Amino acid sequence: MTPLFRKAVWLLFAVSVCAFAGSLAAQYVLGMEPCVLCISQRLCVLATALCTAIVLMCRPRRRAGGLFGAVFISIPAVTGISVAAYQLWLQSLPPGTAPSCGAPWTFRLKGWPLFDWFEPVVRGFGNCAEPDYLLGIALPVWSVAYFLAVVLTVWWAWARAK
């Protein structure tokens, strides 16, 4: 792994941890009630952080290893982009016409062995079609920006690594 690629992955790890902490702070400090899609995006942020940590621990030595790392980090980020884009579409629909965004994560994972430990991360029953704003910008737009920055950064760093 070249120094540039390694620094980029460290940066993505730090930004991902901050984004995850920010999503928890928005819920538990600011009192925002996350919806199912918000929690899905939160899980994609967490998965991105975990993928960057794994790539940092594996320390790929060849360009092909860096390629694997870039793909590995990009998968949860691209998934997050698609979830956030779907939520933006839901929020663009006229009031009352948006479909349900699914069963709450707490319902889906109730029988899971680690549910008691993981429950604060997936708790939330907000309405997916009702936008919440941060600095005047809808939260799914922030999510798309974050995930897009992850994808662009990791592929830029991989392309520059020689």
Curated annotation (Swiss-Prot):
Q: Which residues cross the membrane?
A: 9-25, 44-60, 68-85, 142-160
Q: Which GO terms describe its cellular component?
A: plasma membrane
**Which loops or segments lie on the Cytoplasmic side of the membrane, by the record?**
1-8, 61-67, 161-162
Spell out the molecular function terms from Gene Ontology. electron transfer activity; protein-disulfide reductase activity
Carries keyword Transport?
yes
Task: Report disulfide bridges, numbered on this chain.
Answer: C35-C38, C101-C128
The main location is membrane
Keyword hit for Nucleotidyltransferase: no
Biological process terms in GO annotation: protein folding
Write one Pfam family the protein is assigned to: DsbB
What topology in the membrane does the UniProt record assign?
Answer: Multi-pass membrane protein
Record topological domains on the Periplasmic side: 26-43, 86-141
The protein's job, in short, is:
Required for disulfide bond formation in some periplasmic proteins. Acts by oxidizing the DsbA protein.
The UniProt entry's sequence similarity note says: Belongs to the DsbB family.
Name this protein carries in UniProt? Disulfide bond formation protein B
Q: Which organism is it from?
A: Neisseria meningitidis serogroup B (strain ATCC BAA-335 / MC58)
